[in-house]
Each structure stands twice: as structure tokens, then as C-alpha cells.
A protein has these predicted regions:
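Structured beta-strand-rich core segments of catalytic domains in phosphoester-bond hydrolases
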Residues: 1-48, 52, 56
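Extracytoplasmic, non-cytosolic globular domains
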Residues: 38-123
């Protein structure tokens, strides 16, 4: 986007890159384009892994007023998955969705019986990836295929050096900028992670 906050996928050389693409999000009722979804088709041993890196439209103007933007992106991604992946593939969908796991775009549009949102599981590690007015929740999520794989760990990565405490005693991820002010942090979101084996 205009701030240079774009999506990328870094791939270890142990993986073979079979294909890559930028999934365009062209919403006809929006004057401003939103970020592409980065797609990578990888091969590890005999397993095909489809990776989708997302940063969906913000909640600027309010969750309800902006909801249709994220629902549209979810519909585009769902259609891409249905048309371009096979049942034997392992799909790995990650990013900042600017919606929570229970919101329409994720719970009703994207995540069907073939997928599971790991941030909805009771054994997720951490209290959330984002703190909004003192309330932690998951804007940043990892969604995977309902396949035969072994989960090792997943959740939000949080260390003391990444955080700050405000005057109310509330703990937040330390952002880089707040308006024109430089706070020397890395992000107002915590990174999410997943470790698994097939």
C-alpha cells in the first residue's frame, strides 16, 4: 500500500517453489485497490503446500461499515482455493485479516469444512495478536487444511522487549509509529507462528 506495508513470502531452500502468483483484489464498488494476496505453491518431499499471505482491508470507519470489503476478499480467496488447489494439497493461509475468527468473512465465507482456523482452538498459545482498548483478540491468524498433520505449537509470539505498558497498566505491542511520533517498536501487532510436521 502507500505506506509500503505489503505482503511477502520467504521460502527456505529446502522447499521447491513450483509456482507463485499475486491474487488481485479488484472490488468494483471500491475506488481504492487493496493489497494483493501473495500465493506460493511449494513442494516439500512429496507434499504440495499452498501458501497464501494476506493483509485484508482495515476497519477504518468501523467494523460494520467496512465489513463488505473483507467479505469480498474472502470470497475471492475462497474461489481461488476451490479452483486452483486439489484435495491432496495442504493449504496454509496466514496474515492480518483485520477481522476476528468469528466474523463473517472468516467464519462464514472462507473457513469451510476443509479448513480450520487455529486461532479458534482452545490450546492456542497466547492471549491474542492485537490489543484494542485493553481487549486482546486475534486479527492475525493461521488457517490450515483439515489434513493428517501433527501440530507442535502455534499462537502469538510475545517477549517483554516487544511490549510497552501504558498509564493504565495495560500492555500493548510497541508500535513503530503513532501518527507522526516515532516509538521505536516493531509493530502494534504480535507475530503469529505455527510449527507442525506431516
Amino acid at each position: 500500500d502507500g505506506r509500503g506495508i505489503d505482503c511477502a513470502l520467504l521460502v527456505d531452500e529446502k522447499f521447491e517453489v513450483l509456482n507463485s502468483d499475486f491474487i488481485k483484489i479488484n472490488n468494483p464498488i471500491e475506488s481504492r485497490a487493496t493489497r494483493d494476496i501473495v500465493f506460493g505453491k511449494l513442494k516439500f518431499k512429496n507434499q504440495i503446500i499452498n501458501v497464501f499471505v494476506n493483509h485484508w482491508p482495515s476497519r477504518w470507519g468501523g467494523q460494520e461499515a467496512s465489513n463488505h470489503k473483507r467479505v469480498f476478499v474472502a470470497e475471492v480467496l475462497r474461489k481461488y482455493i476451490d479452483n486452483n488447489t486439489s484435495e491432496s494439497d495442504f493449504n496454509l493461509i496466514m496474515g492480518d485479516f483485520n477481522d476476528y475468527p468469528t466474523n463473517e468473512s472468516l467464519a462464514e465465507v472462507l473457513v469451510k469444512d476443509d479448513l480450520v482456523n487455529l486461532m479458534s482452538k482452545s490450546n492456542v498459545s497466547g492471549r491474542g495478536s492485537y490489543n484494542y482498548r485493553g481487549n486482546w483478540d486475534w486479527l492475525d491468524q493461521i488457517i490450515v487444511s483439515q489434513d493428517d498433520f501433527k501440530l507442535i505449537s502455534f499462537g502469538a509470539f510475545e517477549e517483554d522487549f516487544m511490549m510497552y505498558t501504558n498509564k493504565k497498566g495495560e500492555v500493548y505491542p510497541n508500535r513503530s509509529f503513532g501518527g507522526n511520533n516515532w516509538y521505536a517498536g516493531f509493530s502494534d501487532h504480535l507475530p503469529v507462528f505455527l510449527r507442525f510436521t506431516f
